[in-house]
C-alpha cells in the first residue's frame, strides 16, 4: 500500500528540527519505506503487517521513536481531542451487527448540518494525499481517516430506509452501486450493510453506497465508525 504524507501535516504531531530528507532516511530504516520526497510530500510504501503507520499520526509516531536512535531529537505531540457529550438517545437507529465480523460499531446522528465547500487549507491537504475534495462533511471524514488512521464514513441519515442498519456477510451475486457510480456483483462473504428496506447501502471497509450518499441536499448525517475483525 502506498500513501502520501505532506511534511507540514506530519509536523502537527512530530516535534523535531530534522529536515525532511533526514526523516525520510531514518524512517526507511525502521519499517516504512520512503520512496521519495517530492514538493515536501513523503511517498511511503506501507507493508501489510504495518498498517498501524498508514496515517499521518502513525508515521509521526514511528519517526518520533526512530529518530532519537540516530541522535536526532524528536518527540510525538500528543493528540488532544475535546470531550463531547451526547444526548444518550439511541432511538434514531436500529442496528443489528454480527459482532464476529465487526467487534465495535459506533454511529452518531448529527442533525441540521450545512453542506458547503471545505476551507482551502483542508482541501489542500486532501489534494496533497491524493483525495478529491467533495464537500465539508465528506472531506472531514476523509481528513480524519488520513490523519488518525481510523476509517470513518458518513451516510445521509434520511436515505437509510426504516432508520435501520444490518451489518452482515453478503450473499452471492448481491449487487451494490458504490459512490463512484460502479455497480458490483458481489461474490459472497463480503461485509455489507443493508437498510430497513433490504437495500445494500455500504460495502464495509471499501466504499459506501450511492443510494445513501451525502449530497448538497443532506440535512442529517449519520457518522459511522467501526472496527472490523482483520480475519474478515
Located regions from the model:
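RNA/tRNA-interacting regions in translation and RNA-turnover enzymes
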Residues: 1-232
Amino acid at each position: 500500500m502506498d500513501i502520501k504524507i505532506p511534511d507540514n501535516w506530519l509536523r502537527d504531531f512530530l516535534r523535531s528540527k530534522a529536515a525532511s530528507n533526514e526523516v525520510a532516511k531514518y524512517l526507511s530504516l525502521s519499517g516504512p519505506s520512503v520512496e521519495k520526497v517530492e514538493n515536501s510530500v513523503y511517498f511511503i510504501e506501507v507493508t501489510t503487517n504495518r498498517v498501524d503507520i498508514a496515517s499521518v499520526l502513525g508515521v509521526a509516531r514511528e519517526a518520533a521513536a526512530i529518530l532519537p536512535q540516530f541522535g536526532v531529537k524528536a518527540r510525538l505531540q500528543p493528540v488532544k481531542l475535546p470531550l463531547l457529550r451526547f444526548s444518550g438517545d439511541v432511538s434514531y437507529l436500529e442496528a443489528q451487527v454480527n459482532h464476529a465480523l465487526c467487534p465495535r460499531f459506533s454511529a452518531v446522528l448529527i442533525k441540521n448540518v450545512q453542506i458547503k465547500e471545505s476551507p482551502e487549507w483542508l482541501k489542500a491537504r486532501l489534494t496533497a494525499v491524493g483525495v478529491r475534495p467533495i464537500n465539508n462533511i465528506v472531506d472531514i471524514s476523509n481528513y480524519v481517516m488520513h490523519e488518525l488512521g481510523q476509517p470513518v464514513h458518513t451516510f445521509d441519515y434520511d436515505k437509510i430506509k426504516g432508520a435501520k442498519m444490518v451489518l452482515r456477510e453478503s450473499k452471492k451475486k448481491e449487487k451494490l452501486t458504490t459512490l463512484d457510480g460502479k455497480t458490483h456483483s458481489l461474490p459472497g462473504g463480503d461485509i455489507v450493510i443493508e437498510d430497513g428496506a433490504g437495500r445494500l447501502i455500504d460495502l464495509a471497509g471499501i466504499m459506501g453506497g450511492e443510494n445513501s450518499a451525502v449530497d448538497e441536499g443532506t440535512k442529517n448525517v449519520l457518522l459511522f465508525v467501526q472496527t472490523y475483525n482483520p480475519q474478515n
